[in-house]
């Protein structure tokens, strides 16, 4: 790969990184305006990440156009820090979300979830009283449970439905309780349950109570968070590949000259030619 080809890669990788950052910011803003408070609280890190990546790209672009070795050094240093942070977070995300899955029940299409199946990190976060009060408030306001009776008119429809983890865990008692369903959001609690599961006593038909204090509800939230984290981890892998391409291509150019410093100056000169077409770059 020649110098021109490598510099071409740097320019286009920077452009792709900037476009990716803009897309991340737009997605974060969209999430903050089209979702309830439960998910909206997760959008700030998304917007912040997009803004930070955009800032890095601007630093690299200005460093090349203004022939500033200092800016290019800053660009490389910050880019390396971001790469390490993304790598660490992605590895931790895959480790934390490795455990936990749904359990099938005869006659039901949807799965049920058990809190102890998930990682100790999830258990610590969801068993924290202040955290759960906040999450429970969001779940009640979202009225997902109230909407079940409108979505599924009959018990047969409910049993054949693919309920979300939160609907399955927070809106109904665990199947082992044995409470007969009157409709999709109301159960006959006069039935004497022989199950030792404490969730059976915690469930109430009241809209603000349901099974929001149950471990099954926390397990449903854990499964939801696991899915979200996996998506973020996959996105981070793509982002890592894009950023590492930028770092490696910059390093390759640096190795073509008499050391990293001269390499950075050479990159800035070549890129400066595109930014200032009337200026003849100095040849090294």
From Swiss-Prot:
Q: Which is a Gene Ontology cellular component entry for this protein?
A: membrane
Residues on Extracellular side: 33-43, 97-228
Q: Which InterPro entries match?
A: TET_plant, Tetraspanin/Peripherin
Primary location group: membrane
Protein localization: Membrane
Q: How does it sit in the membrane?
A: Multi-pass membrane protein
Sorted UniProt keywords? Glycoprotein, Membrane, Transmembrane, Transmembrane helix
Name one process (GO BP) from the record.
auxin-activated signaling pathway
**What positions does the record give for glycosylation?**
99, 128, 183
Which residue windows are transmembrane per the record? 12-32, 44-64, 76-96, 229-249
Question: Which Pfam family would be a valid example here?
Answer: Tetraspanin
Similarity-based family? Belongs to the tetraspanin (TM4SF) family.
* Function comment: May be involved in the regulation of cell differentiation.
Instruction: List the protein's name.
Output: Tetraspanin-10
